[in-house]
């Protein structure tokens, strides 16, 4: 078991090294899009399932509260937090619509959808992206593996941040790091700090 634990650390480190080569430009572009969205008085909606739901909530909490610097709250909503809404939609319609119906109600042109799926194939995330596109929203997608069906929904104005791994746990670990990079870039751009 000790070797397996050590291997997990080694694999995680290697995946992050690979991601450090592949992802910085797309992370920077996504952060710039989010900054412009927020400067325009718009908001960011975030969604995911399971661990990715946790990531969506983590991102929203960092924006609504703070990341590492004191600053005003920023508008972000995790669509996975309202159990009454989610269970009503899943019961009355379908689980695939739990995020899309919220986007039709809350999403506005100029808002951003942060869509998170390690496989890129989650049905309710795909429906959420379709709803966002119909509302003239921009999409930032956090994916892994081959990007799945989500990759096919991306337009020129959207950004896919695809972790170079086929292992769900490694993808999730990098997704968290990407979220922290996004939050850091948003904060440092909107609220520059004296680095001295």
UniProtKB/Swiss-Prot annotation:
Binds 1 zinc ion per subunit. GO terms for cellular component: cytoplasm. InterPro entries: GmhA/DiaA, Phosphoheptose_Isoase, SIS_dom, SIS_dom_sf, SIS_GmhA/DiaA_subfam. It is found in: Cytoplasm. Its EC number is 5.3.1.28. Its main location: cytoplasm. Pathway: Carbohydrate biosynthesis; D-glycero-D-manno-heptose 7-phosphate biosynthesis; D-glycero-alpha-D-manno-heptose 7-phosphate and D-glycero-beta-D-manno-heptose 7-phosphate from sedoheptulose 7-phosphate: step 1/1. Keywords: Carbohydrate metabolism, Cytoplasm, Isomerase, Metal-binding, Zinc. Zn(2+) binds at residues 58, 62, 172, 180. This is Phosphoheptose isomerase.
């Amino acid at each position: 078991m000790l070797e397996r634990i050590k291997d997990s650390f080694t694999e995680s480190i290697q995946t992050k090294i690979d991601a450090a080569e592949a992802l910085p430009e797309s992370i920077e572009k996504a952060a710039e899009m989010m900054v412009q969205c927020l400067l325009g008085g718009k908001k960011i909606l975030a969604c995911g399932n399971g661990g990715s739901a946790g990531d969506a909530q983590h991102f929203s909490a960092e924006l609504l509260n703070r990341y590492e610097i004191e600053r005003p709250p920023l508008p972000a909503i995790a669509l996975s937090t309202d159990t009454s809404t989610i269970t009503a939609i899943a019961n009355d319609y379908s689980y695939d619509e739990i995020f899309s119906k919220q986007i039709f109600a809350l999403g506005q042109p100029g808002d951003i959808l942060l869509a998170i799926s390690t496989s890129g194939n989650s049905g309710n995330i795909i429906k959420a992206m379709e709803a966002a596109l119909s509302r003239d929203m921009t999409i930032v997608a956090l994916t892994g593996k081959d990007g799945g069906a989500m990759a096919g929904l991306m337009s020129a104005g959207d950004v896919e941040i695809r972790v170079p791994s086929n292992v769900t746990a490694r993808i999730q670990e990098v997704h968290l790091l990407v979220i922290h990079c996004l939050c850091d870039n948003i904060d440092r751009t909107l609220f520059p700090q004296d680095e001295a």
